[in-house]
C-alpha cells in the first residue's frame, strides 16, 4: 500500500512537471535577432498584449547564428531572422519549419514586390522584416558624382588607396562578377576565378575592408568612395557627412532579413504571434524609423515621414530595385571557393 502511494505521488510530481514545462514553453518565446533590430519597448508591449514573455538575444552575423543553431540542436530558438541566402541554405538543410501564413493576419501589409523571391518562392519559410542593399558611396567633397556610374569605375587608377570594400566574400565578388556581366550568385568555377583575377587588379585602390560599420572609413576620411550598406549611408547623411549614393548601371546588391522558425522550435504558436505583432503597420513603421532600415511593409511605409520615404538612400524607385540582384544560396562547396579566393585577395 505504501509502495502504491509512493508510486502515485511520483506520477503526480512528474505530471506536474510536464504541465509546468508545457505552460512555461507556451508562455515564453526565445527570439534570436540581429543587434539593434528591435526598438526598446516593443517586446514589452508584445508581452503586455499577449502574456507571452520574450527571451531576447542577438548576433552579429548569419554565420554565428547558423553555427549556434547547428551546435545546440536540442535547446533551440523559436524565432530567428536570417538574411537572404541563409534562408535558402537553412531551408535546404531542413533547419526551418514551413510557416502557416493563415495565422498571420498582417501578412497582407507586406509589399508584393518583396515576396516570392528566388531564395524562398511563395514565402513558405520566411516572412520579410527588413531589407536593404549594397551600392557605391562617394564623399562628394572629394569626388564628382558625374564621374561614377558603374562598379567598373572603382578600378580607375586615379582612385589609388581611396576605396573601402565591405569585408564580405560574397558581396565583394558580386561586384566583380556584375562588372564582368555575370550573376552575383555565380557557381561556375571559371567565372569565379575570373572575378578573383579582376579583384586582384583592384588591390592598389583598396584602402580598407570593413564590415562592422562600412560608414566608418568615410567618417574618418580614410575612404573617398566604396561599397556601403544603405542603412549606414543614411545614418552618415544624418550626421552631416557629405556622402552621396550612386546607383551602378549594372545594378545594386540587394538583401533581406526575414523572420523564420527553426525546425526544433518549442513555441511555434508564440513565434507566429510575435511575427504577426511585428507586421502591424504601426509597429513596422516604428522599427523602420528608429533603426534606420527600409521596411518591406507597405502599410507601415505609408505612416513614415515624407522625408524618409522620399529619400532614395532608403527607398530607391522600382526600376532600380528590379535592376538589382538578390543573393541566393550557392551551396557550401562553392561558398568555400569564394572564401578561399577572398582570403588570398586580402593577403595580397
Regions found by a protein language model. Name each.
Residues 4-17:
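Bacterial N-terminal signal peptides
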Residues 22-89, 216:
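Early extracytoplasmic/lumenal segment of secretory-pathway proteins
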Residues 76-77, 81-87, 91-205, 210-219:
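Extracytoplasmic ligand-binding site segments that recognize negatively charged/polar headgroups
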Residues 86-89, 219, 224-242:
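A ligand-binding cleft/hinge motif common to bilobed small-molecule-binding domains
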Residues 135-142, 178-179, 255-267, 286:
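A bilobed periplasmic-binding-protein/Venus flytrap-type ligand-binding module shared by bacterial periplasmic
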Residues 192-201, 237-263, 309:
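Periplasmic-binding protein-like
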Residues 262-322:
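Mature extracytoplasmic/periplasmic domains
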Residues 319-348:
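Conserved C-terminal helix/tail region of periplasmic/extracytoplasmic solute-binding proteins
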Amino acid at each position: 500500500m505504501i509502495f502504491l502511494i509512493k508510486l502515485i505521488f511520483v506520477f503526480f510530481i512528474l505530471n506536474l512537471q510536464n504541465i509546468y514545462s508545457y505552460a512555461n514553453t507556451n508562455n515564453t518565446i526565445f527570439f534570436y535577432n540581429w543587434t539593434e533590430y528591435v526598438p526598446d519597448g516593443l517586446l514589452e508591449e508584445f508581452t503586455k498584449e499577449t502574456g507571452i514573455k520574450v527571451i531576447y538575444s542577438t548576433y552579429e552575423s548569419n554565420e554565428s547564428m547558423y553555427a549556434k543553431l547547428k551546435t545546440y540542436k536540442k535547446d533551440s530558438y523559436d524565432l530567428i531572422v536570417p538574411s537572404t541566402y541563409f534562408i535558402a541554405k537553412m531551408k535546404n538543410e531542413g533547419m526551418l519549419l514551413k510557416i502557416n501564413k493563415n495565422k498571420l493576419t498582417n501578412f497582407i501589409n507586406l509589399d508584393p514586390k518583396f515576396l516570392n523571391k528566388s531564395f524562398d518562392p511563395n514565402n513558405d519559410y520566411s516572412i520579410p522584416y527588413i531589407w536593404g542593399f549594397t551600392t557605391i558611396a562617394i564623399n562628394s567633397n572629394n569626388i564628382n558624382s558625374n564621374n561614377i556610374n558603374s562598379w567598373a569605375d572603382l578600378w580607375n587608377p586615379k582612385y589609388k588607396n581611396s576605396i573601402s570594400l565591405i569585408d564580405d566574400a560574397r558581396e565583394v565578388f558580386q561586384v566583380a562578377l556584375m562588372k564582368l556581366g555575370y550573376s552575383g550568385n555565380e557557381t561556375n568555377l571559371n567565372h569565379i576565378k575570373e572575378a578573383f583575377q579582376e579583384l586582384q587588379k583592384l588591390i592598389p585602390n583598396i584602402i580598407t575592408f570593413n564590415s562592422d560599420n562600412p560608414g566608418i572609413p568615410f567618417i574618418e576620411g580614410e575612404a573617398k568612395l566604396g561599397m556601403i550598406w544603405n542603412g549606414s549611408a543614411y545614418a552618415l547623411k544624418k550626421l552631416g557627412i557629405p556622402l552621396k549614393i550612386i546607383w551602378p548601371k549594372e545594378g545594386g546588391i540587394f538583401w533581406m532579413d526575414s523572420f523564420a522558425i527553426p525546425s526544433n522550435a518549442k513555441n511555434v504558436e508564440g513565434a507566429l504571434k510575435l511575427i504577426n505583432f511585428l507586421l502591424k503597420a504601426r509597429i513596422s513603421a516604428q522599427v523602420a524609423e528608429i533603426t534606420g532600415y527600409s521596411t518591406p511593409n507597405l502599410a507601415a511605409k505609408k505612416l513614415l515621414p515624407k522625408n524618409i520615404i522620399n529619400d532614395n538612400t532608403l527607398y530607391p524607385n522600382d526600376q532600380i530595385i528590379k535592376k538589382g540582384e538578390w543573393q541566393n544560396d550557392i551551396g557550401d562547396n562553392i561558398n568555400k571557393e569564394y572564401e578561399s579566393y577572398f582570403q588570398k585577395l586580402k593577403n595580397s
